[in-house]
Amino acid sequence: MKFISALRLLVINLVFLIIVSIVIIALSSTDIPSVPKKTALLLNIQGSLVDQKNYIDPLTQLIGQADPSQQEVLVQDVIDAVNFARDDQRITTLVLSLDQMRYGGISKMQEIAPVLQAFRDSGKKIIAFGDIYTQDQYWLAAQADEVYLHPFGGVLIEGYGLYRNYFKKALDKLEINYHVFRVGEFKSAMEPYMRDDMSNEAKQANLVWLGDLWQQYTSGITQRRNLAATAVDEYINGIDKLLEQYHGDTASVAVASGLVDGVKNRDEVNAYLISQVGAEDEDGNYQAVGFKKYLWLKRLESSQPVTENKVGIIVASGNIVDGDQPAGVVGGDTLSLLIRDARMDNSVKALVLRINSGGGSAFASEIIRRELELLRAEGKPLVVSMGSMAASGGYWIAAQADQIWATPTTLTGSIGIFGAFPTVDKSLAKLGISTDGVGTTSLAGHCGLIVRYSHWQQR
């Protein structure tokens, strides 16, 4: 196994070196492509918007076995591309093509909306088109000056909800005993193992934050589209009557409800964009540059020299767990080492910690918090930027900051802690399996799935 692992690592490193060599040769032997005048920036988001991409094995990427459904796009890349385009005279229009955007998240999209507004304020137009808009796709599309829909398309908005499966009866039938210890009456994470339904406390808490998210979602549409404050709710709650009125034509319903400005086939969209951009490429399509290529070109053009004074930026995205972890998971040891490096680096004068985490290991959270405490003790300011969520352990580490910044829809705070473990001694007893033995103390051998915990041990 060690030989196979070593061979795999060698192959990955060799492939990486070959790719880097090819890129260097290509850049040194050819001119960097330029962006033509009167070009549209195509914001074609493919995948989910994230603060940090999950780690994917390079060999898996190389042989093309990465799951397309797991594609991710950095929010900061979108923001940077739009900001560059705003001041670029070659870019005259921004086109939102969001059919392949899987998940946005209202908090992340709210960070993109201001840069889209700044793009419009510069006198440039934003046009959105799509076949069918999902809930997240439509919110981002609604930030455009003009929104178009395919004649066979529709706008699918459902609202926010939280529904869970509950296992109490199943566990009782299987005679599996779940020992749950929690602090905080609103800490409902383990309710599925303790109840057959959602508690009133959980319903109350969930309705509060879901209602806040929904208000932010709907107002972001109605204000931008100049609709009545209740327009989105009326669209959803009255969809049956609207479909009957328009003979099942979902696109016409969207137009009549003010959600889109019109319907266009794909060829009509292309012709319209040619008229707007004023340019056409050799294939007969409107002149456009994808935002990823554009961002790469602009970063090459505007590369900044290394300075002595820097602000460090570290992203903590995912569940907080112990040890070393890849990108997309907050490893206690991994993140604390990055913070320590920033503390020891004299050129780093301050640190911004971006947190998007619902928490996890209390121990790992404390390891991270301690490193942040040491960083501040060195006199380096710490600013926390919260993403969609910074809860429980995520808030524990954020509380160490000099300043904390969040979006209107960030879920943050901590409502308690819990611990849980199952025992199956009764289940095994039904099968004729028993456990017995001796130990040198009252605790010896009393940690596992097949033992019965005494009252004092549970305490």
Regions found by a protein language model. Name each.
Residues D261-K264:
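A structural motif shared across PLP-dependent enzymes of the aminotransferase-like
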Residues E244-T250:
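Extended, domain-scale alpha-helical bundle/helix-rich regions
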Residues D267:
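Extracellular glycan-binding segments that recognize GlcNAc-based cell-wall polysaccharides
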